[in-house]
Design a protein with these regions (language model features):
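Terminal targeting signals and extreme-terminal segments of soluble enzymes
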Residues: 1-125
Length: 125
């Protein structure tokens, strides 16, 4: 699965830990380049992980994998992300013929919820 994450996602260090029907769990070791000037994980990195976790969950929501693109996303930053690792858990809320609603949550290495997001994705075929 990790070889299918694409070059950007591999570049930033994302790894798929578990993928099931309509679910995805990603992990990423926090590196210095993921941090903002305050020393916490940059919001763009958080948004990337929300998008990828929700997107992979949407890809595997049905009997066969389907290609998706993100139509819209909404992130809620609840607490600064610090520590050594980010855990992302994505799940499908509803998958239709053309669109999918997914939700993803980010946790720090202490298991604290730090960020949550909703994604609307469009199926390409």
């Amino acid at each position: 699965m990790n070889e299918n994450l694409g070059p950007f996602n591999r570049h930033v260090g994302l790894r798929a830990e578990a993928v099931g029907r309509g679910t995805c769990r990603l992990i990423c070791e926090i590196r210095p380049e993921h941090l903002n000037p305050r020393g916490t994980v940059h919001g763009g990195m958080s948004a990337t992980m929300l998008d990828v976790a929700g997107g992979i969950a949407a890809i595997y929501a049905g009997d066969q994998p389907r290609q998706v693109v993100t139509q819209s996303s909404d992130a809620h930053y609840l607490r600064p992300l610090t520590g050594t690792m980010i855990i992302a858990e994505g799940r499908v809320i509803r998958a239709g013929r053309h669109t999918c609603l997914a939700r993803a949550d980010l946790y720090d290495d202490q298991g604290r919820l730090c960020c949550t997001g909703d994604l609307e994705l469009f199926y390409l075929e």
